């Protein structure tokens, strides 16, 4: 009713204050309304209500009389009154309200009744009445002894109330009391279909979760409700403990399979990390187009299934899963966006914008350190584009501007430029394999591995090229070839590659660095597979090393390899933690914490986060004081012995909090607050790790509050905090071209112009911000942030754990570890194909994703959208939906490569 309507004749009765209090719907006259405040409630009732009240009282009295023949009509009338009182949702129905005072009397009458139909009938009415009384679950008690008639006839509110009581009652019964659970189950079987039919799917799920009978869902779900139910179940997964979370996923998966929604089922099987199930779903689907779509999803997730050759379209499916076309599809996107022109590092640094009084800061020195930075930047910016201006034309000139290990990283950056282009890339790298410089050769070997990252090839070129160098006399050559194999076969768990690498760890010629890199590479190849050989070899290597060797900074990679092998495996690490008990401190705590956090990566496990916070709050004082005395003697020894201090495992704990919490929004928000406290009050080792944790929790998602925090700590007094903060800024904005971040980094470059180490970090961050000219992402989550790619997490962890000792590893000689990020690089694009896999440009709406869990109807899933034509880029937290009715996507989540089908019902 519009505002002015109040002065006109009352068309529609507006609820008066008295009605709000007393629940009457009649509109009393003005005089009555004035007096309503001071009169007693009894007298507020209108004529009609008074009549109703008297009638109900008479019915109750009639039940108390001796004449049993009157019971039936009285009960029928009571029931009619209760049911016919259609009421607003906000107030209690009138008959129930007037019957409340007689509740006790009705119960007495019920007790005195002779058993039979009338008694059951009375129980029904008391059950409904009990809903308004806060009693001891009497609603349920009387329902069970009642006449068992249709639940629906009493309305939704009653069903809801009953469901709540069933859940409470169930939890109080022991498993032993099976008999008493039976009637409850019968009741549940009535409630579920009712809820399903009345848009209350999530209430049905809640009830079944409470009584741990989720499997009952499957048979009551119909075509219209399944999507909502599964969305609700999967969104609850983060909030329930083991093993219920996998039960929910398996239930949703069963529902999807019931309705032949194979892509959705596959996604859940990947969440469960159950490869047999993945294969089963893939092979049981008989529709080739859907199979191709699933192959795209598996390729994106880094999973390869060995199909039998007689499968229809075997070659196509294998090719899609192997990501063979990734490079050509990516370049098609680049051409579409018109960004093929190679960039040089100066385009990124924008030195001309720095207002120095003495010319640009870049022009002063051509130092090896800055050239190394430029090699990385050049690789990051032109990643996967296949051409650049420094290396692809005449690389030797550039390579010799670097020295020693710098040459290794510079040569390897060629692999990043040629990323995913196995056939074309290897020929360009080949000439460097014959260089006279070991460093360049080693870099070229690493480049071969990088090119093959995430792409499978029948001929296994990486294995063929690199296997000869794994036990080479020169440790430099070993490094490039081993790390290269790790990147090329990450996530494949290939036995032949592992048997080649594992012996290197125990080889007498291997330096600690080589042993560490080998453990890393094996961890990446066997990521999340609990491979027994990898576990035993790494453990054996740790046991064999002396205490001094374990103090070497590269020793940290051994437990990291162990952790990666058990990534996301939870309980499965108990045996390893027990085996590590024999190692001496401080290495033991470091290794334990690292393996522990890897096992719970992305799980959002609150209890683990609490344990880690305890570790963070420990203090190590006594050692500091002794150190002061020994400082002078130790100065020279100190260079190599980084993790020797007691607090090293605290840094890992901080990273671990981010690693565990990054899986779900609420956990990540809480972790953010914690990091704020740690930065202000933590020990130095803690503070150094916090920027890295911030980077991990928000990879490729430049949120302003995180950028501001990092920007503040990029001027910190502790140089390692500032190095890590600057690098973290690059990680947070990786591949976004974020203008605000770019400006911040340019200011930092000026501020640190005289400090080569900080400047090196600023350059790295600038390169990352413009990763792949803004088309790639490092975020390990995909498919609407539901799936965590283990290979990507392995790559990120490799880099971040190395940054815990930034001075000796990244700023020392092992900057090649930065290429671990290659494992996490993925194009953040949406490309649409027709059923023949030809590119099909269609218009799509791209906007911020909206959470629609548990909402009624068909709510909008995106907000603030713009319409583009595919191929398009998707930023963090964005979602796409088709803007035309003409096509239907084979998978509901539009991300990566999506196959579209003609809509049969579309009329031109």
From Swiss-Prot:
Keywords carried by this UniProt record: Acetylation, Phosphoprotein, Proteasome, Repeat
Modification sites for N6-acetyllysine: 551
Annotated stretches, region: Disordered: 1-52, 623-645
Pfam families given in the database record: PC_rep, RPN1_C, RPN1_RPN2_N
SUPFAM superfamilies in the record: ARM repeat (SSF48371)
Subunit details: Component of the 19S proteasome regulatory particle complex. The 26S proteasome consists of a 20S core particle (CP) and two 19S regulatory subunits (RP). The regulatory particle is made of a lid composed of 9 subunits, a base containing 6 ATPases and few additional components including PSMD2. Interacts with RPGRIP1L. Interacts with CRY1 in a KDM8-dependent manner.
Official protein name in the record: 26S proteasome non-ATPase regulatory subunit 2
Origin species: Pongo abelii
């Amino acid at each position: 009713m519009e505002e002015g309507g109040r002065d006109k004749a009352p068309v529609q009765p507006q609820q008066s204050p008295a009605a709000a209090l007393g629940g009457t719907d009649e509109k009393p006259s003005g005089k009555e309304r004035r007096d309503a405040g001071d009169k007693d409630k009894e007298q507020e009732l209108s004529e009609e209500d008074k009549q109703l009240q008297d009638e109900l009282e008479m019915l109750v009295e009639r039940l108390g009389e001796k004449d049993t023949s009157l019971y039936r009509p009285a009960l029928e009338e009571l029931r009619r009154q209760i049911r016919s009182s259609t009421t607003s949702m906000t107030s209690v129905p009138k008959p129930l309200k007037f019957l409340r005072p007689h509740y006790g009397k009705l119960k007495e009458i019920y007790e005195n009744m002779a058993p039979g139909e009338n008694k059951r009938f009375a129980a029904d009415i008391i059950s409904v009445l009990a809903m308004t009384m806060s009693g001891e679950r009497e609603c349920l008690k009387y329902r069970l002894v009642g006449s068992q008639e249709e639940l629906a006839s009493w309305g939704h509110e009653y069903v809801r109330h009953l469901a709540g009581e069933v859940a409470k009652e169930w939890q109080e019964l022991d498993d032993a009391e099976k008999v008493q659970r039976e009637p409850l189950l019968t009741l549940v079987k009535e409630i579920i279909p009712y809820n399903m039919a009345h848009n209350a799917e999530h209430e049905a799920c809640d009830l079944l979760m409470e009584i741990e009978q989720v499997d009952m869902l499957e048979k009551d779900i119909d075509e219209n409700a399944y999507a909502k139910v599964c969305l609700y179940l999967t969104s609850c997964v983060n909030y329930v403990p083991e093993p219920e979370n996998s039960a929910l996923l398996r239930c949703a998966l069963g529902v999807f399979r019931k309705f032949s929604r194979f892509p959705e089922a596959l996604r859940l099987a990947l969440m469960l990390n159950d490869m047999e199930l993945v294969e089963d779903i893939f092979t049981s689907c008989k529709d080739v187009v859907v199979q191709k779509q699933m192959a795209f999803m598996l390729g994106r997730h880094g999973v390869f299934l060995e199909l039998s050759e007689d499968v229809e379209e075997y070659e196509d499916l294998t090719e899609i899963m192997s990501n063979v076309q990734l490079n050509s599809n990516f370049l098609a996107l680049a051409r579409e966006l018109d960004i093929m022109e190679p960039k040089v590092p100066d385009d990124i640094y924008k030195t001309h914008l720095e207002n120095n009084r003495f010319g640009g800061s870049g022009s002063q020195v051509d130092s090896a350190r800055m050239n190394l930075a430029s090699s990385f930047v050049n690789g990051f910016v032109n990643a996967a584009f296949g051409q650049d201006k420094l290396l692809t034309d005449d690389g030797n000139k550039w390579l010799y501007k670097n020295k020693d290990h710098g040459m290794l990283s510079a040569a390897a950056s060629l692999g990043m430029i040629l990323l995913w282009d196995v056939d074309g890339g290897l020929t360009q790298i080949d000439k460097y394999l014959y260089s006279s410089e070991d460093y360049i050769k080693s870099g070229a070997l690493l480049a071969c591995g990088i090119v093959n990252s995430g792409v499978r090839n029948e001929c296994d070129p990486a294995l063929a090229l690199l296997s000869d160098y794994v036990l080479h006399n020169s440790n430099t050559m070993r490094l490039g070839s081993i790390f290269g194999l790790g990147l090329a076969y990450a996530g494949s768990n290939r036995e032949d590659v592992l048997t080649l690498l594992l012996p290197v760890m125990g080889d007498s010629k291997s330096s600690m660095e080589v042993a560490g890199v080998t453990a890393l590479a094996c961890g990446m190849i066997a990521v999340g597979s609990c491979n027994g050989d990898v576990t035993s070899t790494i453990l054996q290597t740790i046991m064999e090393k002396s205490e001094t060797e374990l103090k070497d900074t590269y020793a940290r990679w051994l437990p990291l390899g162990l952790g990666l092998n058990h990534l996301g495996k939870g309980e499965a690490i108990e045996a390893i933690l027990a085996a590590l008990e024999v190692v001496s401190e401080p290495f033991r705590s470091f290794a334990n914490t690292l393996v522990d956090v890897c096992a719970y990566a992305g799980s959002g496990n609150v209890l683990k986060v609490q344990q880690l916070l305890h570790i963070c709050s420990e203090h190590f004082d006594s050692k500091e004081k002794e150190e002061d005395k020994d400082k002078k003697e130790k100065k020279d020894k100190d260079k190599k012995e980084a993790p020797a201090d007691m607090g090293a495992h605290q840094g890992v704990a901080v990273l671990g909090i981010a690693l565990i919490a990054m899986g779900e929004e609420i956990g990540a928000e809480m972790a953010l607050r914690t990091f704020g406290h740690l930065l202000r009050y933590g020990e130095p080792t803690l503070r150094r790790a916090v920027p890295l944790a911030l980077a991990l929790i928000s990879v490729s998602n430049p949120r302003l509050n995180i950028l501001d925090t990092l920007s503040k700590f990029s001027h910190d007094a502790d140089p390692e905090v500032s190095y890590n903060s600057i690098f973290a800024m690059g990680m947070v904005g990786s591949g976004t071209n974020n203008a605000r971040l770019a400006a911040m980094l340019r200011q930092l470059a000026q501020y640190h112009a005289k400090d080569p180490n900080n400047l090196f970090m600023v350059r790295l961050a600038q390169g990352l911000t413009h990763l792949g000219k803004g088309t790639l992402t490092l975020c390990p989550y995909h498919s609407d942030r539901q799936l965590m790619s283990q290979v990507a997490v392995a790559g990120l962890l490799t880099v971040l754990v190395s940054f815990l000792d930034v001075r000796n590893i990244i700023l020392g000689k092992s900057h090649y570890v930065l290429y671990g990020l290659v494992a996490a690089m993925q194009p953040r694009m949406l490309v649409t194909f027709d059923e023949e896999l030809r590119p099909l440009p269609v218009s799509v709406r791209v906007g911020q994703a909206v959470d629609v869990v548990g909402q009624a109807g068909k709510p909008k899933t995106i907000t603030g959208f713009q319409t583009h034509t595919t191929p398009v880029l998707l930023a963090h937290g964005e979602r796409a939906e088709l803007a035309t009715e003409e096509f239907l996507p084979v998978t509901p989540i539009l991300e990566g490569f999506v196959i579209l089908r003609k809509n049969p019902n579309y009329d031109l």
